[in-house]
């Protein structure tokens, strides 16, 4: 669980950290510090100077103690002894006399505590790797002596796999992302959770089959011995990486169908039976040499259903993938057809949680077929993350558009996911506040219209369902109260266009120069939507003159769509496909075909 503890002290007073660009405070951290502790102290000094204009000296704890200190991390000061309960990532922020204490581990806790202090008590916001808000005080920065906050994360592993957090370790620290996949997390920010070798679909390499689409027979002794040999080799080559994935091939029809494998499938009631037994055996065989290594696998598509007899080894992570779910609504609603052979995702989740000590979730948070189309899943993210926490999940990997800017609301989605991964129990009001703060800063004066647009896309898709692979958003979003779906689509487009027009007008020439571009970039998804509305209209019209008019509208919309993508540097319109802006596409075709 996450524990957030507030302790009220009766007679409060203020700690005046800076006044008129001067300070009496020094920042203190451990002499025998880690890189992360040093980063924490230096980052605090840097941001406090930006906020107040005052220079905060930074010293180690072998210096003489002073009355006015900001203590960062566990060190040689009263009340600053290490607390095991905080783990690697937890922290306590409190006041003791005239001292401000930001206490946390030498791994990441002290650093995370610093960024939380800057957010909660100084008004900083870390929205993306390129955009943050750092307020300035005209004269005095003070904090209430009643401060006493402890936070310990629910999830030991947190990874938001979106472009706005990629390839920048500092935004990872600011958003408390510790998953190393896609993020260059070094000792500077306390390191992270890194996998040894591949992150997923690793069995073809480990078993040396050379076949990425077909699963090898896991009852074959040669396959086992080859895999065991390669697991040992990888662990010896990179002994600092303590997790290695032994996971199935991608796709939905890769399992072996030999008699031995089929017998295990029937005995276990699941196709993951052979895989769990295979990995359990490897764990036992490497236990003496690598006692602290954790083996990892996927429960994905045909292996999603848990086995009925064999439990995963205590030293195993199972990453359960919610690939088949409807993402418009909370996953627990189960608003799609369920194959009785595999069961529903919530059912699988609860059963896995009973037999697996370290259960992770692979969470899909974009439309991989059309990454710049409207994807109204923002209202489902919070209940989904709470479901994972309630069910005992200890790690979440939220996969999105990781390779490029998102022509929709990807930057907002990534920010919200990071907040939820740290605190999956936040209430609706807090969640809405995070959304509002992001929009009002990232989109500037246009943010109020983007917020109305967000509400509208969710209202207009309330009765629809969507998976992670769909190309036609016009099938999902339509304004209610019109004679037919298509008429409602045109009405939605007109209203949404009006909101974006106002947002652009409010941000053109604004001091926040990036706001206009951010509004324009998010508008790409509306152009994408309109393309499918026009396509549907063309299919419904019988009159050739009307069809010709629609064809001209399609060409004009596609031309504007392409210009906007080039202007905002959005190259990837679907997974594994990037546009070449030096070549002008055929505007009579759909963007998915460019």
Where are each of the predicted segments found?
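Substrate-binding cleft/loops of secretory-pathway carbohydrate-active enzymes
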Residues: 299-327, 373-379, 407-413
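Active-site-proximal loop/turn and secondary-structure-junction residues that shape catalytic pockets
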Residues: 250-252, 299-303, 322-324, 365-367, ...
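Acidic, His- and aromatic-enriched active-site or binding-groove loops in soluble protein domains
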Residues: 265-279, 313-332, 420-425
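Short, well-ordered secondary-structure micro-motifs within conserved domains or adaptor modules
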Residues: 57-84
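Catalytic domains of carbohydrate-active enzymes that cleave complex glycans
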Residues: 420-594
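Feature activates predominantly on carbohydrate-active enzymes
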Residues: 23-24, 28, 32, 36-43, ...
């Amino acid at each position: 669980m996450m524990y957030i503890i507030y302790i009220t002290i009766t007679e409060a007073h203020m700690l005046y950290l800076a006044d008129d660009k001067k300070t009496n405070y020094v920042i203190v951290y451990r002499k025998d510090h880690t890189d992360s502790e040093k980063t924490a102290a230096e980052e605090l000094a840097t941001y406090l100077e930006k906020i107040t204009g005052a220079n905060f000296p930074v010293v180690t704890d072998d210096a003489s103690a002073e009355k006015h200190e900001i203590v960062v991390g566990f060190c040689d000061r009263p009340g600053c002894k290490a607390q095991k309960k905080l783990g690697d990532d937890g922290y306590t922020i409190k006041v003791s006399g005239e001292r401000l204490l930001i206490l946390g581990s030498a791994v990441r806790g002290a650093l995370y505590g610093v960024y939380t202090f800057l957010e909660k008590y100084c008004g900083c916001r870390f929205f993306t790797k390129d955009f943050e808000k750092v307020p300035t005080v005209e004269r005095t920065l003070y904090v209430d002596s009643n401060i006493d906050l402890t936070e310990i994360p629910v999830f030991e592993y947190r990874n938001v796999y979106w472009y706005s957090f990629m390839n920048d370790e500092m935004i990872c620290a600011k958003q408390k992302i510790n998953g190393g996949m896609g993020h260059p997390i070094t000792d500077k920010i306390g390191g992270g959770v890194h996998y040894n070798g591949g992150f997923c679909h690793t069995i073809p390499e480990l078993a040396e089959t050379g076949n990425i689409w077909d699963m090898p027979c896991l009852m074959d002794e040669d396959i086992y011995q080859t895999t065991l040999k390669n697991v040992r080799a990888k662990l010896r080559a990179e002994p600092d990486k303590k997790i290695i994935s032994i996971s199935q091939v991608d796709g939905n029809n890769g399992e072996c169908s030999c008699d031995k494998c089929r017998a295990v499938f029937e005995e276990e009631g699941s196709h993951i039976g052979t895989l769990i037994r295979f990995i359990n055996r490897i764990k036992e065989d490497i236990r003496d040499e690598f006692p602290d290594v954790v083996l990892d696998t996927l429960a994905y598509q045909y292996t999603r259903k848990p086995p009925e007899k064999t439990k995963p080894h205590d030293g195993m992570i199972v990453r359960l993938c919610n690939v088949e779910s409807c993402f418009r609504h909370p996953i627990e609603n189960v608003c799609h057809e369920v194959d009785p052979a595999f069961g529903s995702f919530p059912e699988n989740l609860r059963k896995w949680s009973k037999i697996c000590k370290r259960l992770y979730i692979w969470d899909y948070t974009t439309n991989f077929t059309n990454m710049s189309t409207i994807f109204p899943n923002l209202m489902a993210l919070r209940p989904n993350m709470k479901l994972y926490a309630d069910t005992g999940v200890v790690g979440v990997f939220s996969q999105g558009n990781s390779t490029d800017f998102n022509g929709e609301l990807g930057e907002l989605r990534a920010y919200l996911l990071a907040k939820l991964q740290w605190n999956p129990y936040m209430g609706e009001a807090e969640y809405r506040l995070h959304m509002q703060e992001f929009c009002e800063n990232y989109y500037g004066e246009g943010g109020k219209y983007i917020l109305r647009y967000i509400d509208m896309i969710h209202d207009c898709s309330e009765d629809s369902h969507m998976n992670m692979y769909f190309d036609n958003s016009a099938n999902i979003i339509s304004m209610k109260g019109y004679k037919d779906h298509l008429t409602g689509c045109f009405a939605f487009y007109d209203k949404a266009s009006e909101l974006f027009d106002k947002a652009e007008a409010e941000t053109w020439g604004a001091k926040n120069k990036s706001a206009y571009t951010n509004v324009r970039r998010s508008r790409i998804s509306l152009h994408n939507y309109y393309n499918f509305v026009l396509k549907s209209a063309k299919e419904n019209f019988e009159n050739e003159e009307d069809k010709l008019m629609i064809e001209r509208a399609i060409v004009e919309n596609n031309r504007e769509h392409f210009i906007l993508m080039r202007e905002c540097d959005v190259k990837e319109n679907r997974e594994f496909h990037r546009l070449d802006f030096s070549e002008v596409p055929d505007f009579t075709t759909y963007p998915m075909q460019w």
